[in-house]
């Protein structure tokens, strides 16, 4: 049997936090409500591991929700940050580090000719929506069910991430007028997109999507889907936007657009490009980006945008990722992990379906296949909650939601992967 976990100190801290912050957390999914438990309070992280305040160590497959692709607290990133810290934390003025990271992003990402740094993925998506409308002169936008583009009002329509996990159709406080111009379609359904364009001639500014959905579990694009979106947007004078906050520099150095060979007009980024510090960015064709203030009339600004610490961590992280063999290693360890999970479940007659690409993976507790959000919802969330609790007791930290992708890192070793597969085998055996 799996031993119980001592989380007394975590429980005390979370109990106090609930009187200080809504739900006791700074972001909803951290509260563990989706897995019917109380959260683990972390004390420190290093490499592929996280330690809680009770001294328990976990092999971490959340990775701070994506940024920690090189592993937590990578010594080269920490050293670079310490050097920059001596010069100050924020200038509120241009710094050469912005140029350096911008050049790296432009060199790597096929669609990006110019880039603007912000402080979060939500900010990037808010700005890119405004830019889509400013450039085209059209108000409507198409998004996909289960795709999450941050918590801005206009995107909280059939969204993924915490909204999917908690079963909330939308968020209270979002006026209908705000989302009236947000059209939705099922992911991987090109015909539905074509119908929306036919029903709204010359009114749609563009299509935004996670090219690989990581906020409704892990859903990959069907062959021809991304290519079809590129074609239909061009035919209708609309923009194609890839939200690569999660996939950027993770499923390949040039992101999903490099991996799948489809170049959008605009791209949003975050997570990895900040190396664990708050960051976001949006970029694209120079013709479009020239609309952004102060070059053009579309206003967007930020006090801490392009701050030297985030730029430093991003530069060093991308330097590490450019090293030979990086993505081959990530692909191999992630495939081994997922194959091990799927095999262990099937040996215990537990229905499961999963996929992986490079350093991202996900599984659903159903027969599959899962091609869209509606099919994802057939996953057994109660069973996932049980698996999550048991894996914590085995020293493995999975995302506390059945609808979030998992992340591997360069710091995960063969021993870590083997230990994780062994833990899955043991808990699946206990369940069967």
UniProtKB/Swiss-Prot annotation:
**Which one of the record's GO molecular function terms can you name?**
glutamate-1-semialdehyde 2,1-aminomutase activity
Show the CDD domains listed in the entry.
OAT_like (cd00610)
Q: Does the keyword Repeat apply?
A: no
Q: Which cofactor does it need?
A: pyridoxal 5'-phosphate
The protein's superkingdom reads Bacteria
Query: E.C. number, please?
Result: 5.4.3.8
Keywords linked to the UniProt accession? Chlorophyll biosynthesis, Cytoplasm, Isomerase, Porphyrin biosynthesis, Pyridoxal phosphate
Name the protein family: Belongs to the class-III pyridoxal-phosphate-dependent aminotransferase family. HemL subfamily.
Q: What is this protein called?
A: Glutamate-1-semialdehyde 2,1-aminomutase
What gene name is given for the protein in this entry? hemL
């Amino acid at each position: 049997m799996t031993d119980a976990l001592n989380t007394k100190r975590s429980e005390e801290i979370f109990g106090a936090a609930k009187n200080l912050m809504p739900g006791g957390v700074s972001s909803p999914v951290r509260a563990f409500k989706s897995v019917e438990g109380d959260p683990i309070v972390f004390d420190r992280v290093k490499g592929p591991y996280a330690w809680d305040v009770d001294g328990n160590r976990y092999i971490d497959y959340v990775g701070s929700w994506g940024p920690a692709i090189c592993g937590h607290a990578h010594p080269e990133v920490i050293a670079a940050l310490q050097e920059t810290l001596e010069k100050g934390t924020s200038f509120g003025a241009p710094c050469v580090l912005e140029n350096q990271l911008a050049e790296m992003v432009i060199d790597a990402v096929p669609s990006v000719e110019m880039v603007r740094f912000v402080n979060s993925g939500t900010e990037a998506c808010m700005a890119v929506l405004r830019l889509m409308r400013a450039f085209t002169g059209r108000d409507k936008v198409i998004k996909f069910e289960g795709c999450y583009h941050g918590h801005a009002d206009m995107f909280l329509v059939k969204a993924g991430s915490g909204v999917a996990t908690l079963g909330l159709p939308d968020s209270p406080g979002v006026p209908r007028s705000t989302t009236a111009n947000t059209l939705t379609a099922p992911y991987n359904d090109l015909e539905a997109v074509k119908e929306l364009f036919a029903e709204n001639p010359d009114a749609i500014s563009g299509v935004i999507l996670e090219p690989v959905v990581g906020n409704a579990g892990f859903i990959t694009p069907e062959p021809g889907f991304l290519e079809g979106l590129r074609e239909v947007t061009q035919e209708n004078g609309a923009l194609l936007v890839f939200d690569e906050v999660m996939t950027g520099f993770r499923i390949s150095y040039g992101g999903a657009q490099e991996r799948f060979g489809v170049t959008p007009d605009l791209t949003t980024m975050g997570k990895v490009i900040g190396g664990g510090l708050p960051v976001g960015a949006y970029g694209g064709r120079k013709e479009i980006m020239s609309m952004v203030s102060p070059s053009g009339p579309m206003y967007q600004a930020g006090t801490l945008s392009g701050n030297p610490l985030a730029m430093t961590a991003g530069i060093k992280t991308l330097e590490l990722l450019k090293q030979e063999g990086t993505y081959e290693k990530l692909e191999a360890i992630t495939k081994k992990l997922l194959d091990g999970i799927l095999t262990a479940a099937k040996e215990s007659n537990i229905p499961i379906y999963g996929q992986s690409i490079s350093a991202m993976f996900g599984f659903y507790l159903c027969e599959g296949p899962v091609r869209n959000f509606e099919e994802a919802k057939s996953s057994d969330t109660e069973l996932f909650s049980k698996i999550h609790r048991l894996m914590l007791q085995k020293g493995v930290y999975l995302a506390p939601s059945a609808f979030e992708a998992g992340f591997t890192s360069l710091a995960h070793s063969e021993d870590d992967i083997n230990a994780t597969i062994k833990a899955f085998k043991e808990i699946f055996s206990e369940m069967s």
